[in-house]
Regions:
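C-terminal engagement/docking regions of AAA+ P-loop ATPases
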Residues: 52-56, 63, 298-395
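Conserved C-terminal "switch" segment of AAA+ ATPases
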Residues: 58-65, 69, 79, 219, ...
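Pre-Walker A (pre-P-loop) alpha-helix and adjacent loop at the N terminus of AAA/AAA+ ATPase modules
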Residues: 63-100, 105
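Conserved alpha-helical scaffold flanking the Walker A/P-loop in AAA+ ATPase domains
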Residues: 91, 146-168
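Walker A/P-loop
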Residues: 94-131
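AAA+/P-loop NTPase substrate/partner-engagement loops
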Residues: 120-148
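Canonical AAA+ ATPase core
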Residues: 146-150, 175-179, 187-278, 327-329
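Walker B catalytic acidic pair
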Residues: 170-171, 182
Length: 395
């Protein structure tokens, strides 16, 4: 059974019809324009009024996702005061199967947020305190020589604290780069290899790392390969006057509220699959591609500010993060397709850790967010506006 749902496709009112025969999707407009995919061919002709048809179960699942997301936010809000954007970013990472890097000075509630999240989602939780003397085996585990009842000796793998579902890597940049890199395989593959034997981690597996600002003493910058594996980098700021007063009321009155379980692992995996079913139309996909390419200095889509202040641009993981996070945002806005605004909203947390500033930017005190905001402002939504945008950028 099909039902009809009015939505917006990349900022345009639209409706999508999924035809079971031939795996065909079609976007149709009143003027006969639109985009269709079938038989390995794609055709996009913008213009006209679009109408979309969604299968009823898909629409119901999207509405249920919004309701369940709100339930998780409510429980976290019982413990965590403020930091609305940070909580939203953390949950976005969770529902796409990504990992999250939180940056902020000590004492802002980063660890409490992770612990509350694990309690709300009924997931196994381990905390690893990163220190300069921490070794990779302390994280991953190691083979131990064990003696059997018969008196024989054999190697037995003793799992490390990373064998959990929510792993808090606390103050990750206080450990040496060798130890930091121990998480590379676990974050990308969801496995741990010790002495040639691969061990699977239970799903969902979510790494949330916290780090202090890199200018503080006793910190080591994360390797670029590891930073790129974090889906989002979120900046945790200070609480304002009202939030700080609420924190005092909650933590000094003797009764600290607790979050209760409202979701579990299998349900999270279900929502992760739903997110990937959200439609990314070709013109929105092209916008994601052009935004990512605009961060590449000396590239064909590079802007003047890119060439001036960036040494390296975003990897393809940045484009993947924009698309997937945009899909979560679309579901939360009641749509089953990604719009330009969805992409813009997640642009900074998805790319701020994936661009590397050059010496000139560092000398002038330019931050990555400043460069990215300028790119976001100058890259047009529609590809046919590129010549005008290029002329404006040069001027």
């Amino acid at each position: 059974m099909d039902c009809r749902l009015t939505a917006r496709l990349g900022g345009v009112p639209c409706e999508v019809r999924r035809e079971s025969s031939g795996e065909r999707q079609r976007f149709r407009g009143a003027a006969g324009t639109g985009w269709s995919r079938g038989g390995g061919k794609e055709d996009w002709r913008p213009g006209g009024e679009f109408f979309m048809s969604l299968e009823e179960p898909i629409q119901k699942r999207a509405e249920e996702f919004r309701r369940r997301y709100a339930a998780v936010r409510e429980q976290i809000g019982r413990v965590i005061v403020g930091h609305e954007e940070v909580v939203h970013g953390v949950l976005t990472c969770l529902f796409v199967g990504g990992h999250c890097l939180l940056e902020g000075v000590p004492g802002l509630g980063k660890t409490l947020l992770v612990r509350t999240l694990a309690q709300t989602l009924d997931l196994a939780f381990n905390r690893i305190q990163f220190t300069p003397d921490l070794m990779p085996a302390d994280i991953l585990g190691t083979n131990m020589v064990m003696e059997t009842p018969e008196g024989r000796r054999r190697f037995e793998f003793q799992a490390g604290p990373v064998f959990t579902q929510i792993c808090l890597a606390d103050e990750i940049n206080r450990a040496t780069p060798k130890t930091q890199s121990a998480l590379l395989e676990t974050m990308q593959e969801g496995t741990v290899t010790v002495a040639g034997t691969k061990h699977e981690l239970k799903k969902p597996f979510f790494v949330m790392a916290t780090q202090n600002p890199i200018e503080q003493e006793g910190t080591y910058p994360l390797p670029e390969a590891q930073v790129d594996r974090f889906f989002f980098k979120l900046l945790v700021g200070y609480s304002d006057r009202e939030e700080l007063a609420a924190i005092l009321d909650r933590t000094t009155a003797g009764l600290i509220p607790e979050a209760r379980k409202v979701m579990d692992g299998p349900e999270i995996l279900q929502w992760q699959r739903l997110v990937r079913e959200v439609i990314l139309a070709p013109h929105v996909r092209d916008y994601v591609v052009r935004l990512t390419l605009a961060t590449h200095p000396k590239g064909p889509f590079a802007l003047p500010i890119t060439n001036q202040f960036l040494r390296w641009g975003s990897s393809p993981r940045g484009a993947q993060a924009l698309a997937l996070a945009g899909k979560v945002q679309a579901l939360l806005e009641g749509r089953y397709n990604v719009s330009f605004e969805d992409v813009r909203r997640v642009f900074l947390p998805a790319l701020r850790h994936r661009v590397i500033l050059n010496f000139e930017a560092q000398a002038e005190g330019i931050e990555a967010d400043q460069v990215l905001l300028d790119i976001l402002e100058k890259v047009p939504e529609k590809a046919d506006a590129l010549p005008a945008a290029a002329a404006l950028a040069e001027g």
